[in-house]
Amino acid sequence: MENNQSIKGRCKCGEVKYQITEKPLFTQACHCKDCKVLTGSSYVVNSSVLENTLKVEGEVSSAKLTAGSGAASRAFFCTKCGTYVYTDYDSAVGRLNVRTKTLEDPDKFPPQAHIFIKDKDPWLNLSENVNCFVEMYDPKVTWPEESLNRIKDYLKIKKNKSQ
């Protein structure tokens, strides 16, 4: 996928629609206990995007959450149907995490890593072709160089604008 192609997504009822103006930086499946409780599922798949590339239409509400790591975040939901659309993690400066399965074509963005597999359901088998991490990983080691460069460039521009 080209970097400048638009990607669309929505909540279940269609009241919240969004567009991502660049391809995601990285997609991962999280098996931590918090994500399981929050989603009512065995894991969640998130696609990390630069904050300035997500354009949301429709009314969302948010809830402050604290991850198992202690990191704070805000989860954004459709006010009508409650679909959890994206998250803003305090620790992910300049990035937002879109719920990959809310994309129109989520299969274009399969997980590039599985994290917190220490909490993975024992009956769930994972692909041997995808990196698995007991807990979290270091993005500087795991993410593609192109994604790391995009983040670095964006944060540099953002810093220059704020000065």
Regions found by a protein language model. Name each.
Residues 1-10, 15-163:
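A short Gly-Trp-Pro
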